[in-house]
Regions:
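A conserved helix-loop-strand patch within extracytoplasmic ligand-binding domains
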Residues: 96-145, 248-249
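Periplasmic-binding protein-like
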Residues: 132-140, 242-263
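Sec-dependent N-terminal signal peptides of Gram-positive bacterial secreted proteins and lipoproteins
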Residues: 1-13
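Beta->alpha turn/N-cap motifs
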Residues: 29, 57-58, 68, 72-82, ...
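Ligand-binding "clamshell"
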Residues: 83-96, 109-112, 184, 189, ...
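A bilobed periplasmic-binding-protein/Venus flytrap-type ligand-binding module shared by bacterial periplasmic
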Residues: 103-114, 219-232
Length: 270
């Protein structure tokens, strides 16, 4: 995860031409991305000065952004931000733009495709709301379970399963531990960043993974800020920076194309 903060000095507006210090906080592979971006020629061309910090907790990143000690963050999906806004009344984060899509995958050391997973198998699923809901939607798309018609993409839980014909057992885990428990369960649902950190490539190693469509668009990653900053021109330049040719070539090569660029208007996510 990663967080961008644009520190302003002398009380000057972010819309002036003065240099800004942008503090970026993140974790996992996103941290690597923004460490590179901070030193890039593309950032220099846009007169953006970034300082990157590694912060491991997503809620803390969002808290700091909503409270104003951080100006921008870039680590989460639209659904993660939406869940945060729902669960933290009085706060409001908004998306400045889209970045990329990281397919969530189903992994197994024992089986090579979902249909091979036997009745009663144990499937590990994230213990945080948005990742758990996303994982259940992944299992639904694989034809393994059925969910309520009004299933909430951000807060849905295993209690919303309407059909589980194979009687799968679900084990909730800290989603950052997925790669480490592959040998102790039948299958694990793992987010792309965590999988990559664990030496897994979602496009090559998963037995099933997401694709971008109307049902998964909520999982596109974003750059977020507090509501009051949504029209800040300097902050919006970060979106342009991310989509520059130089940065996209780096991301594609560094992460073996597992971070799929998405250049869509924010309205597409809603």
């Amino acid at each position: 995860m990663l967080l961008l903060v644009f520190g302003l000095s002398n009380g000057k507006s972010a819309d002036t031409n003065d240099s800004k210090t942008i503090v970026v906080g993140s974790t996992n592979t996103d941290y690597q991305v923004w460490k590179h971006i901070a030193k890039s020629n593309a950032a220099k061309k846009l007169n953006l000065h970034l300082k990157v910090k590694n912060i491991t907790n997503g809620v803390q990143l969002n808290d700091a952004t909503s409270q104003g000690s951080l100006d921008v963050n870039a680590f989460q999906s639209w659904s993660y931000m939406d869940t945060y806004n729902r669960q933290h009344k009085g706060t409001k984060l908004v998306a400045l733009g889209t970045t990329y899509y990281e397919p969530m995958g189903l992994y197994s050391k024992k089986y090579s495709k979902p249909t091979e997973i036997p009745d009663g198998a144990t499937i590990a699923i994230a213990d945080n709301p948005s990742q758990a809901a996303r994982g259940l939607l992944l299992l639904k798309s694989a034809g393994m379970i059925k969910l309520k018609s009004n299933f909430d993409y951000a807060t849905g839980t295993v209690s919303d399963i309407t059909e589980n014909p194979h009687k799968y057992q679900f084990k909730q885990i800290d989603d950052t531990t997925g790669p480490r428990i592959l040998n102790s369960v039948d299958a694990v649902i793992i987010s792309n960043s965590v999988a990559f950190d664990g030496g897994l490539n979602v496009l090559k190693d998963s037995i099933y993974h997401e694709t971008i469509n109307k049902n998964t668009r909520y999982n596109i990653n974003i750059i977020a800020t507090a509501k009051k900053n949504e029209n800040n021109k300097e902050y919006k330049k970060i979106v342009k920076l991310f989509h520059s040719k130089e940065i996209q070539e780096y991301v594609g090569k560094k992460f073996d194309h597992t971070k799929v660029e998405v250049k869509k208007p924010v309205s597409y996510l809603k």
